[in-house]
Amino acid sequence: MAKISSPTETERCIESLIAVFQKYAGKDGYNYTLSKTEFLSFMNTELAAFTKNQKDPGVLDRMMKKLDTNSDGQLDFSEFLNLIGGLAMACHDSFLKAVPSQKRT
């Protein structure tokens, strides 16, 4: 009988992203998307430091509009991942700027 291995760190991160999306999706109706209200709730709770540091009060509305690539007023999981990926890239860029320059191969 094959032994079932524990999830890797990457697999746990993916599971966590799915769980967080599902935690906020569906409160306003459709279970597979985030409405604008659900998106704002997610941003103000899960990304509170980012949200509070924004000087422009319209930034979240513009983010929602830009992320909503099919213009249905909802964010599906793929659109949600664009947000997560963009934030991860920005964090990675900041990290690279903060550490001493290293030769990349």
UniProtKB/Swiss-Prot annotation:
InterPro entries: EF-hand-dom_pair, EF_Hand_1_Ca_BS, EF_hand_dom, S100/CaBP7/8-like_CS, S100_Ca-bd_sub, S100A11. The modification N-acetylmethionine is found at residue 1. The modification Phosphoserine is found at residues 5-6. The keyword Ion transport does not apply. Ca(2+) 2 binds at residues 68, 70, 72, 74, 79. One of its GO terms (cellular component) is extracellular space. This is Protein S100-A11. The lineage of its organism: Eukaryota, Metazoa, Chordata, Craniata, Vertebrata.
